[in-house]
Amino acid sequence: MLFDKVKAFSVQLDGATAGVEPVFSGGQAVAGRVLLELSSAARVGALRLRARGRAHVHWTESRSAGSSTAYTQSYSERVEVVSHRATLLAPDTGETTTLPPGRHEFLFSFQLPPTLVTSFEGKHGSVRYCIKATLHRPWVPARRARKVFTVIEPVDINTPALLAPQAGAREKVARSWYCNRGLVSLSAKIDRKGYTPGEVIPVFAEIDNGSTRPVLPRAAVVQTQTFMARGARKQKRAVVASLAGEPVGPGQRALWQGRALRIPPVGPSILHCRVLHVDYALKVCVDIPGTSKLLLELPLVIGTIPLHPFGSRSSSVGSHASFLLDWRLGALPERPEAPPEYSEVVADTEEAALGQSPFPLPQDPDMSLEGPFFAYIQEFRYRPPPLYSEEDPNPLLGDMRPRCMTC
């Protein structure tokens, strides 16, 4: 049968070494070949190639239309970011051409648009890039081969906006049974807004406990995924790194003189996609017994081009290339402890009162992994994404007012 004459049919990309696929950025050329191996001569109608890049989001929400009527509302949106078509083999005359047995290679190349979105895989959306080859033959079904490729858009943290220090202050009145127990204040700052994976954030903070009970300061890097469709939004939050300080006694003050918080290997910020965003923030909070947490949030941008001392563009390009190499091949240390759930950092439940650790490990194995940050990367060896929380239990309260930095 003609179907059995095709021994191999695949798409291969140039630049792959030792089984590691290349990583692309906007404006680069994607080149490769379609491999067709025949056991005997075969007639072929056409060989066509299509490259696509698409950002897609989808989620459902339960709605109520009365006391006894419920329905499910679906939200979906997609954006095409790459679209390329090419015919690699077409018969000169007639409807088919005959290929001899053996190995046949059909080269292809196309240019990516100058601006793209980083490959991403989330619970309610994704950004995926792929190349599909289709072999048309008479009287048999078409044969298809698919190749997924990864795009990482450069995010240079060596810009004035991302090099600017970030600081803030908050205070809250501690209450218990409607009694005023004193004022707790928090101020924090970091040296810049932009960081890259593997860097350490030195956290400077001052915690002034004017209440009558001990308080516990903590800090965490939180990732927020925002999905947008038809005017609606869906958010998922995850703690990717955290630290806990020592309790601050009544009437005492504590200073953090650059407490180290290391950024794990996470995906970069995605800020310019119409249907999804990936944002990061440093959240410093103080657990106050009997009162909702005092929370201060400082924005972060996770980039791909690390901080360099001289600001040369050649250095930026080299640093970005180094990031891509580390991202694909870098040997990481042994897998660390999984970070805590987002709700454990910001929820109002006082875990300390139950005698539990402020950062318990997740117990449900089915919830410990929701898929890689990037699509279809077999060699991606970063830690699995942390657990997610559907809602933000810490809306800003009216009694939170700014306070001058003192540290």
Swiss-Prot record:
One of its GO terms (biological process) is protein transport. It comes from Homo sapiens (Human). Pfam families: Arrestin_C (PF02752), Arrestin_N (PF00339). This is Arrestin domain-containing protein 2. Interacts with WWP1 (via WW domains). InterPro entries: Arrestin-like_C, Arrestin-like_N, Arrestin_C-like, Arrestin_domain-protein, Ig_E-set. Belongs to the arrestin family. GO terms for cellular component: cytoplasm; cytoplasmic vesicle; plasma membrane.
